[in-house]
Amino acid sequence: MSLISIRIRSKTGVENIKLESQLKLKELQNIIEEKTKISTDTQKILYGFPPKALDLSNQDAVISGFLANGDTITIENVSSISSNPGVDSVTNDKVTSSTNSFDRNIKSQPFISQEEEEDGGYATRRVTDDDNSCLFSAVAYVLEDKNRLKGYSLRALIAQNVKSDPFEYNEAVLGKSNEGYCNWIQNPKNWGGAIELSILSNHYKVEIAAFDISTQLMYCYGEDRKYTERVYLIYDGIHYDALSICLTKNGPEDFDITRFSVDDKDSLAKMKVLIEKEFKAGKFTDTAKFSLICLNCNKTLKGEKEAAIHASTTGHGNFTEYKKR
């Protein structure tokens, strides 16, 4: 019987374990209880990226149906989770970012969103170019003195970090060989994701907090490393932008603050208000339901999952959003 390696993340820490691929959900939950001390009846299991809650109703479900080798699951105790979805903070290390690239013909809005708060500045969404390197441009904005162009050099930086530590960044973690990943990430057509944010957090020695608009959750990379600073990004399902505190209303980027103490609760609160505003305005894409078309063969697909399966079976990797008229 085949084995799969997964990573379990909870308040108690992170642990790598190997499981039989045909293990049942109820057996997985018993193992989780043993490892995390969170009772099976109060467990919330988050998987995928962005993490989504696993349906626990079918206790006989086989784990290979929703977990793959190298996956990370995040375990929360539902009895201690705040009822305010904007307050939740979870971390996900899922190391396979999107292994298939989707051509960015989906345009982000060319404006700055700002949270209305005068005291101490305004939480502000700074837009990055709508291309396959938006994650890197957003990171460069908040960590490289607001220079988005430096984002293009971050791919090579990530490859150097991965290449220098083949033990940590092995095939089980990356979903491909160390060398193969290093070549893949330097292709400007490929998207960045969770593993890239984790590597960049480690390189810059700061927490990188990414808000997912659709869930209003914050995924904080590097929070277990005791860094003293944090930066913020915003993710709408297909695109990353940078977040800042602008000292004046509708002010220029020169007035932006992008680095914050991890103890700065006021700035965090402002960011959450902005995320809620973006959510209510519907400024996100449901990647599970939106329609795509493969530009290689003109096949229409529903959601990112179907596109990923199509790419893996055909080798096609050029997708764009498809809207029926």
Curated annotation (Swiss-Prot):
Domain of life: Eukaryota
Enzyme Commission no: 3.4.19.12
Compartment(s) of residence: Cytoplasm
Zinc finger (C2H2-type): 292-316
Major subcellular site: cytoplasm
Reactions catalysed, as given in the entry: Thiol-dependent hydrolysis of ester, thioester, amide, peptide and isopeptide bonds formed by the C-terminal Gly of ubiquitin (a 76-residue protein attached to proteins as an intracellular targeting signal)
Stretches for region UBX-like: 7-86
Annotated binding of substrate, by residue: I238
Sequence segments annotated as region (Variable-loop): 185-195
Role: Hydrolase that can remove conjugated ubiquitin from proteins and may therefore play an important regulatory role at the level of protein turnover by preventing degradation.
Protein name, UniProt field: Ubiquitin thioesterase OTU1
Lineage, top ranks: Eukaryota, Amoebozoa, Evosea, Eumycetozoa, Dictyostelia
